[in-house]
Amino acid sequence: MRLIFLGPPGAGKGTQAKRLTDKYGIPQLSTGDMLRAAVSAGTEIGKRAKAVMDAGGLVSDDIVNQIVSERIEAPDCAKGFILDGYPRTVPQAKALADNMRKKNQVLDAVIELKVDEEALIRRIENRVAETIAAGGTVRSDDNPEAFRKRLTEYREKTAPLSAYYSEQGELVTLDGMADVDAVTEAIERVLEKASA
């Protein structure tokens, strides 16, 4: 099972990916984790990424695409994987399609979790209030203003992927505002249909 989750921050992609990882035994691959692993392993591409990051730059699509391409060949990805935070742009999506085609792999599903952004902001505000009331530390990215900025960035940079995957006939859109269990069940129905 090879799967991509799309949706804005706070839509529940991480929660759903964890559930699928636990159930199917396939890895959730995040761009950040893959970059850190490549740098830590000292691979050639990891060294290139480290040089860019050490200089304070953004790692290029070419480097990210190569790291993802190498990672999806790892033995733990033999049964599939869930991509989290990749692709972020249409050029990355096209590079992924090319890489997978060369490996005779296909995506089983691209699932977009649609959410109401104002409801998401209220959800974050409530989470912050609950964390403060419990005496906990608020995550820096849970600041409502920072969260709004992440939503704007998502709309501008990542949202065009929905149109791209829709044109490819690969996009399935689900209600990310539904109960967590209901979303999981809907995702599993999509995956059953894809593997039939």
Curated annotation (Swiss-Prot):
Its EC number is 2.7.4.3. PROSITE patterns: ADENYLATE_KINASE (PS00113). GO terms for molecular function: adenylate kinase activity; ATP binding. Residues 126-142 are annotated as: LID. Signal peptide: none annotated. Pfam families: ADK. CDD domains: ADK (cd01428). Gene3D superfamilies: P-loop containing nucleotide triphosphate hydrolases. It is an enzyme of class 2 (transferase). GO terms for biological process: AMP salvage. The keyword Protein transport does not apply. The keyword ATP-binding applies. PANTHER family: NUCLEOTIDE KINASE. Monomer. Catalyzes the reversible transfer of the terminal phosphate group between ATP and AMP. Plays an important role in cellular energy homeostasis and in adenine nucleotide metabolism. This is Adenylate kinase.
